[in-house]
C-alpha cells in the first residue's frame, strides 16, 4: 500500500520519513503470547534510524526490546542504536531497566543500567527505586544509591514518598520524607505534602499544602495554601477558590482569587477569573 503525502508543497506517493519523528516505518514484533518484544524504526529505504524527539530533534533510540517474566510482567527494557548496540536513552538517562513485581503484578523494584550493563544513576542521582503496597495502593516509594542505601534525591530533596488512601482507594495524603522517614520540603513543589478531600460523590473538593509539621502552608510559587472546589449536580466543576495558611481568601501570583466555570449547550467549559474584590480579570 502507499501513502500520499505533501512535502514542500509537492505531493508524493510512497513512504516518507517523518521530519518530526525521524522515521518512515515502525516494525513491531510479538511473541507467541501476543506480547510486544521489540519496536524498531526505519527510514524510507529500510535503513535503521533513531526516532527523534519532536521538540528538539534529539536522537532517542533506534530499537526498543522488551522482556517478560512468567506472569507477563515487563521484566526488562533495552534501548539500542542503529548498530544494534545498547545506548543511553536521552529522556530516561539509562540504556536498560530491570523490573521486579509482586504476586499481584505490582511493580516493586526498578534498577537502571548503562550500555555496558553497569548500574547508572537517573537524574536526581538514584540508581534504583522500590515501591510498597497495601491492598494494591502504593504506600511508599523509596530511592536508593548504587549500594542500595536510601538516598536523598538531588533534584527534589527527598528519599521516601509516603501515601495514604481512604476506604475507596482515593489518595488523601502524600508526604515527602528524608532517609529517616521525617517530612522534608520537596524543592520542586515547595511543600512537604499534599492533602486531598472529596465530597460524597467522589469529586475532589480540597487540595491542601502541608509543611514539615503538618500545618497548612503557602506554596511560594503559587501564592496560596489551599484550593477549594465546588461542583454542580452533574459533577462539573463550578468554582475554584484560593486560601492562605490561615484559611482566609487569597489570590495567586497573578491576582486571581477565584475561577468560575460555565458550560454552554454543548457542554464546553468556559472560565472567568476574579480578584479578591470580585472584579473580573481580563
Question: Where do the language-model regions lie?
Answer:
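Buried hydrophobic residues that stabilize the cores of well-folded domains
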Residues: 1-282
